[in-house]
Amino acid sequence: MYQAIPYSSTRPWLRPEPAASVVDVVKVETTTAVAGRGGEAEVVGEEEAAEVRRAVAESPVLVVGRRGCCLIHVVKRLLQGLGVNPAVHEVAGEAALKGVVPAGGEAAALPAVFVGGKLLGGLDRLMAVHISGELVPILKKAGALWL
């Protein structure tokens, strides 16, 4: 339980340390973006791309999206409604998809849906395939549905 702190008019309140201001956060993000042109940031991007490649190979259905993106939830709920439990992998940006999508392939938009180790597309493509009735056979062929 929490212990109550007795009130004292003689003892001043200790002010908490100020949180990072928006300016500080923007400076950190800008520094990270500048550092991303070479060196360590590229190595982190390559590690993230390798993680995505491994996850695509392991999962019959994988949803790759940007951290904190609400569209991941939309894709996941659509697939769960069909009886599929997709794996979800959150990444920092679209650079993680470079090694997964073939060089001549279409550009991947996040969230990207991989079915059977192949890129199905983004949310718009998933909705189009679902509405046309082609999604269930694709999921069965990938082994994500057993019905």
Curated annotation (Swiss-Prot):
The text of the family note is: Belongs to the glutaredoxin family. CC-type subfamily.
List, in alphabetical order, the Gene Ontology terms for molecular function in this entry. Answer: 2 iron, 2 sulfur cluster binding; metal ion binding
The task this protein performs is described as: May only reduce GSH-thiol disulfides, but not protein disulfides.
Name the lineage: Eukaryota, Viridiplantae, Streptophyta, Embryophyta, Tracheophyta
Q: Which residues bind [2Fe-2S] cluster?
A: 69
UniProt keyword annotations, A-Z: 2Fe-2S, Cytoplasm, Iron, Iron-sulfur, Metal-binding, Nucleus, Redox-active center
Q: What organism, scientifically named, is this protein from?
A: Oryza sativa subsp. japonica
Q: Where is this motif: Responsive for interaction with TGA factors?
A: 144-147
Compartments in which it is found? Cytoplasm; Nucleus
Residue ranges of every copy of the Glutaredoxin domain listed in the record: 49-146
Q: Which residues form a coiled coil?
A: none
What is the protein name given in its UniProt record? Monothiol glutaredoxin-S5
* UniProt signal peptide: none
PANTHER family from the UniProt entry = GLUTAREDOXIN (PTHR10168)
Which GO cellular component terms are attached?
Answer: cytoplasm; nucleus
